[in-house]
Regions:
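Short Gly/Pro-enriched turn/cap motifs at secondary-structure boundaries
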Residues: 19-20, 102, 249-253
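Extracytoplasmic
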Residues: 25-27, 34, 69, 78-82, ...
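A generic structural signal for nonpolar/aromatic side chains embedded in well-ordered alpha-helices
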Residues: 30, 143, 225-227
């Protein structure tokens, strides 16, 4: 996997101090558990539940008493897979926290029940084949409905590996801008797969052009199965009475909240 990996765990323009937030897991060539660990604590002093509950994370928990803390807080140390649990007096439910992926082999050891050894010898003439998991739309639907940054990043890297043979968001973005997106009204400034980067800039006219391109290539019926409808996904509690006529995706670009998608009028006219 490593020879194909030609990028970093964080994207260009990501906020480095968001490393502890669930919406910014590290990217990796072979993600495990979504590169996050889930911690659950019903009340102060109770047993901390882990998901996945494996010894790698069990030994990474460091419980601390903090008399000044009302709420229980969990903070991962910035450059280490150590999670400090600051005990407070208020109940704590469930949260997810990214872990550092450089120790992935240790996670695989626990999961696969195979001892990891640093010295690796490559076998010769073994059969090689690609194993496919979920159909494409089964990945894209939760990505769009949850606005899942991790899915978006890893999907772009998988596209890069499929098209270019390497995992590099910068190389695949450059390729797409020179091919599929070469005729956009304005050349976008595109930095990553999720939109976490503060460097991303797309004009509304370019969004409309991309939506038009997708509708012509894939058809509206397929897109309706992928995009959130009114009162669904990130549109929950919005456009409730118009749920059968709107399919769209929310997004934030450099501090501006946007909504891009499709609207079907009473006269059956499709608006982008």
């Amino acid at each position: 996997l490593l020879p194909n990996w030609q990028t970093t765990e964080y994207g260009s323009g990501w906020a480095w101090n968001d490393y502890n937030e669930s919406y910014m897991p590290e990217r990796s060539a072979l993600p495990i558990y979504g590169n996050v660990v889930e911690l659950k604590l019903q009340q102060a002093g109770s047993r901390l539940e882990l998901k996945p509950d494996i010894h790698f994370f069990r030994f990474a928990i460091n419980e601390l008493a903090d008399p000044l803390t009302q709420n229980i807080r969990v903070v991962r140390r910035q450059n280490k897979n150590t999670f400090d649990v600051l005990n407070g007096r208020q109940p704590y439910t469930t949260s997810q926290f990214p872990f550092m992926t450089y120790e992935n082999p240790r996670l695989l050891e626990d999961t696969l029940k195979i001892e990891w050894r640093e010295r690796v010898r490559f076998a010769q003439a073994l059969p090689f084949k690609t194993l496919h998991s979920q159909p494409t739309d089964s990945l894209l639907k939760p990505l769009m409905h949850r606005s899942d940054n991790f899915f978006a990043e890893q999907t772009l890297l998988m596209v890069s590996n499929k098209v270019l043979g390497v995992m590099s968001e910068s190389k695949i973005i450059d390729t797409i801008l020179k091919t599929d997106f070469k005729d956009l009204p304005q050349a976008p400034r595109w930095a990553d797969g999720s939109g976490l980067s503060r460097y991303n800039l797309f004009t509304p006219q370019s969004f409309v052009a991309i939506l038009d391109k997708m509708e012509k290539e894939f058809g509206l019926e397929r897109l309706k199965e992928i995009f959130p409808a009114g009162n669904d996904g990130t549109l929950r509690n919005y456009y409730v009475s118009d749920s059968a006529f709107i399919w769209a995706k929310t997004g934030t670009l450099s501090g501006v909240v946007a909504l891009s998608g499709y609207l079907l009028t009473k006269k059956e006219k499709l608006l982008l």
